[in-house]
Amino acid sequence: MKVDLNIHIMSWMCREDDVIDPDLIQLKNNHEQMIVDISERISIRFDYPLSHSVLLQFDGKKPWRLADLINAICAGYVKIYDEEDETRTLPASAPLDSILVNRPKTDGKHGIWGHILNDLYIESIYKGSDGVWLLDIGS
């Protein structure tokens, strides 16, 4: 199953203590209540815009609704960007006299390059044959 979304991550949630109530959000075609997984724990692979892919696991009450999965994805990105900020030595913004428009690559745990968190949006989500949720992330 592949779900096409085009949801801007920061419009869905801002920080981990600011999770949006899925009942207040209506996704395209009202799919927010759609059951997408019946496991108690899910795994999501994050690979964009990272130099090294990251597999994160999330516990939740089953079944997982699409809105719950999106909240987990957003929380995962916040965690990844926070870890990068805690472990990097290079600046995350380009100097004012630089011609670089996007975020420069940093040398932290994940090697984030090209985009700040606010640039990202979820294009689609799908479950791989190994049971891991995979993401198409745009910017």
Task: State each model region's role.
Residues 36-38, 48, 124-132:
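Short, ordered beta-strand-loop transition motifs
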Residues 50-72:
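Short, contiguous acidic and Ser/Thr-rich linear segments
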Residues 33-36, 51-57, 76-78, 83:
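Non-catalytic macromolecular-recognition regions in eukaryotic signaling proteins
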Residues 22-25, 56, 86, 90, ...:
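Preference for intrinsically disordered or flexible, low-complexity segments
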Residues 56, 114, 128-139:
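Generic recognition of long tandem-repeat/solenoid scaffolds
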Residues 1-51:
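Charged, low-complexity intrinsically disordered regulatory segments in eukaryotic signaling
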Residues 75-129:
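Short loop-to-beta-strand transition segments
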